[in-house]
Amino acid sequence: MKKTKVLLTTLLAGAVVLSGCSSKTETSSSSNKTEQKEEKKNSNEPKLGTPIIFDKQAEITVKSATWTDERNGFESKPAKKVLLVTYDIKNLSDKDIPIGMELSLYVNGKKAESYPIQVTLNSLSPNRALENATHAFAVNEEGSLELEVQPFMSTSGKKIIKLDVK
């Protein structure tokens, strides 16, 4: 159990350190052009059940995000709610990739901590797929939920799925 926590913590720290993000904001003098760009941007937003392809790296499909009553009796950090995310991943690269570091949850813009239940930590060979991988998050406040999706050590940008979990 301690080795799993150390591995998970190390991978999370590595993902945070190595993930870079850039945001581009385009402005237009015409409000019509701005509205059209926003419509196109919204239509390309990733959604649950829709495959997200990261060029020559991975294809990730977030299948579901549900609240669970399951708790880890050994976890010292309290969790008001636990969100369990289930996803499929396919390795599109020519090298093994680590599984379990693709997702980050933000609640009201604040990063939620991973919660140690049903966490899939694995590796995936080239051109292979893993179905029903899971990742859990501790959610301690109400608000908007955004799931960031990005393969571990990816150079391509992350994708954000806005969640509406009841």
List the predicted regions and their residue ranges:
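Bacterial N-terminal signal peptides that target proteins for export
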Residues: M1-L8
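Conserved functional micro-motifs across diverse proteins
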Residues: T10-L12, V16-K166
